[in-house]
């Protein structure tokens, strides 16, 4: 039997029916049997504060860090806010990286998908997330890049992914499966 890798999916939008959450669900459905994708919620994470860390870390921080630690890989799916990372996602990245020297992210293979209603597909957010991933020692898949624009047209009225977008997302998640296998073997 082949290895099944657990993938923590971190969605940078808090809206229940956001385009990013829909794309994350679609990727989960398209994932090959070697990947088990699970969305890790970030909406309940208090803002990171080192003073709070020193006194008593909130249970939500502990839960989040443990979910990331238990995963074999991480997939970020994010919108773009003001040409950068949404605050909730940056906070989750910070929470997972602390306390210093105990990052839950370290060494986990990763990829970034940005989804936007606009034409450039969240390019700014995608690259801002990647900057943090370099510092966090996360090997990030470089190709194919996933800047998905025109998010409103990706799904039909029933919420099903359209046939035009499916092949790209399928190729992306298949390549990510290979990336995870390659980098978890190191």
UniProtKB/Swiss-Prot annotation:
The keyword Protein transport does not apply. InterPro entries: Flavoprotein-like_sf (IPR029039), FMN_Rdtase-like_dom (IPR005025), NAD(P)H-dep_reductase (IPR050712). It comes from the Bacteria. It holds the Pfam family FMN_red. It catalyses: a quinone + NADH + H(+) = a quinol + NAD(+); a quinone + NADPH + H(+) = a quinol + NADP(+); Cr(6+) + 2 NADH + O2 = Cr(3+) + superoxide + 2 NAD(+) + 2 H(+); Cr(6+) + 2 NADPH + O2 = Cr(3+) + superoxide + 2 NADP(+) + 2 H(+). Binds 1 FMN per subunit. Its EC number is 1.6.5.2, 1.6.-.-. GO terms for molecular function: FMN binding; NADH:ubiquinone reductase (non-electrogenic) activity; NADPH dehydrogenase (quinone) activity. One of its GO terms (cellular component) is cytosol. FMN binds at residues 13-20, 80-83, 116. Non-competitively inhibited by sulfate. Optimum temperature is 80 degrees Celsius for chromate reductase activity. Coiled coil: none annotated. Optimum pH is 5 for chromate reductase activity. It is an enzyme of class 1 (oxidoreductase). Its cofactor is FMN. Keywords: Flavoprotein, FMN, NAD, NADP, Oxidoreductase. Belongs to the SsuE family. PANTHER family: CHROMATE REDUCTASE (PTHR30543), NAD(P)H-DEPENDENT FMN REDUCTASE LOT6 (PTHR30543:SF21). Catalyzes the reduction of quinones. Acts by simultaneous two-electron transfer, avoiding formation of highly reactive semiquinone intermediates and producing quinols that promote tolerance of H(2)O(2). Quinone reduction is probably the primary biological role of ChrR. Can also reduce toxic chromate to insoluble and less toxic Cr(3+). Catalyzes the transfer of three electrons to Cr(6+) producing Cr(3+) and one electron to molecular oxygen. This reaction produces transiently a minimal amount of the toxic Cr(5+) species and reactive oxygen species (ROS). Homotetramer. Dimer of dimers. The tetrameric configuration has a central role in chromate reductase activity. This is Quinone reductase. It comes from Pseudomonas putida.
């Amino acid at each position: 039997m082949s290895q099944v890798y657990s993938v923590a999916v971190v969605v940078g939008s808090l809206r229940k029916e956001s385009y990013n959450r829909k794309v994350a669900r679609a990727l989960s459905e398209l994932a090959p049997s070697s990947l088990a994708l699970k969305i890790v919620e970030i909406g309940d994470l208090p803002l990171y504060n080192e003073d709070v860390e020193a006194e008593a870390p909130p249970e939500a921080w502990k839960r989040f860090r443990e979910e990331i630690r238990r995963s074999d890989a991480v997939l970020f799916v994010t919108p773009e806010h003001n040409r950068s990372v949404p605050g909730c996602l940056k906070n989750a990245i910070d929470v997972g990286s602390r306390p210093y020297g105990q990052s839950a992210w370290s060494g986990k293979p990763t990829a970034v998908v940005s989804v936007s209603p606009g034409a450039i597909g969240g390019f700014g957010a995608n690259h801002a997330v990647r900057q943090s991933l370099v510092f966090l020692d996360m090997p990030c898949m470089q190709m194919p890049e996933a800047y998905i624009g025109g998010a409103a047209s990706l799904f039909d009225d029933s919420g099903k992914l359209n046939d035009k977008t499916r092949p790209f997302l399928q190729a992306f998640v298949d390549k990510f499966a290979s990336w995870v296998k390659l980098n978890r073997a190191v």
